[in-house]
């Protein structure tokens, strides 16, 4: 199971638009993995520490974006240490990277960027050499997307290659017209329990993009079951008397085309 934290007041107050979530979903999907949850958090130490404490206890793989710098509003490193009940220590590999980056201009403030919870390992930063860190299965990278992206990919390819394609999934959906979601509940309930490992979903649209009002109705999950579940769903909608058409493919999934 993979989770994500996107950290920073600048996201919550609208000064910056998050670019991490869509990237992480795609980075996982192209490796046959899936994101199970994501939380947005501000720069509040107590809330951060509580969140880290919960996910550390769950032993989940988590990517955390932002807040690992050394300015007064960066709290991630300290809160991870508090959640794990360990000390912050200057990591020797991080110190080497920072000194190699700044040379004679290395200062105590810059070295603080290499203080990680005791027991951490570093995540190399190919952009400016200031590393992120992993603590257990939690991986902490900067809030700058151009730095975070190669660092996340390095972690995935280094730490989780053995899991690639474990969660390969496919999706199949239709656009149902002249029906509201409540009118499609029976069709969804008729299909879901019959196919363990497949989720039935609905996504209504008011036609904001110029299309007809419709409900996207579909199934996603185990590729071996999706086609059969999709046919069962279409059959239920057809029997209910609602017109429908095939939906466009969704990026990041092995979509199957409705028969």
Where do the PLM segments sit?
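Glycine-rich phosphate/diphosphate-binding loop of Rossmann-like nucleotide-binding domains
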Residues: 1-38, 43, 227
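Glycine-rich beta-strand-to-loop/alpha-helix junction loops that act as flexible
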Residues: 7-9, 64-72, 142, 203, ...
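Short beta->alpha linker loops
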Residues: 40-43, 93, 111, 179
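An accessory alpha-helical subdomain
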Residues: 137-236
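Mixed-charge, glycine-accented linear interaction segment located at domain edges/termini
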Residues: 226-228, 244, 248
């Amino acid at each position: 199971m993979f989770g994500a934290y996107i950290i920073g007041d600048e996201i919550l107050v609208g000064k910056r638009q998050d670019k991490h979530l869509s990237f992480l979903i795609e980075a996982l999907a192209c490796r046959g993995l899936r994101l199970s949850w994501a939380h947005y958090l501000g720069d509040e130490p107590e809330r951060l520490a509580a969140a880290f404490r919960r996910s550390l206890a769950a032993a989940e793989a988590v990517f955390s974006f932002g807040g690992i710098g050394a300015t007064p509003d960066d709290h991630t490193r300290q809160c991870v240490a508090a959640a794990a009940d360990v000390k912050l220590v200057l990591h020797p590999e991080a110190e080497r990277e920072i000194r190699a980056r700044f040379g004679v201009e290395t200062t105590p403030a810059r070295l603080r960027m290499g203080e990680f919870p005791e027991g951490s390992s570093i995540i190399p930063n190919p952009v400016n050499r200031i590393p992120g860190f992993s603590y257990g299965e939690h991986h902490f990278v900067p809030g700058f997307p151009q730095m975070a992206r190669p660092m996340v990919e390095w972690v995935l390819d280094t730490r989780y290659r053995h899991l690639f394609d474990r969660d390969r999934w496919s999706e199949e959906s239709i656009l149902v017209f002249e029906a509201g979601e409540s009118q499609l509940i029976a069709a969804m309930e008729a299909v879901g329990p019959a196919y363990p490992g497949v989720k039935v979903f609905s996504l209504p649209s008011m036609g904001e993009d110029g299309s007809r009002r419709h409900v996207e109705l579909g199934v996603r999950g185990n590729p071996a079951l999706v086609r059969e579940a999709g046919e069962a769903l279409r059959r239920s909608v057809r029997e209910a008397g609602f017109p429908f058409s095939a939906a466009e493919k969704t990026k990041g999934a092995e979509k199957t085309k409705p028969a």
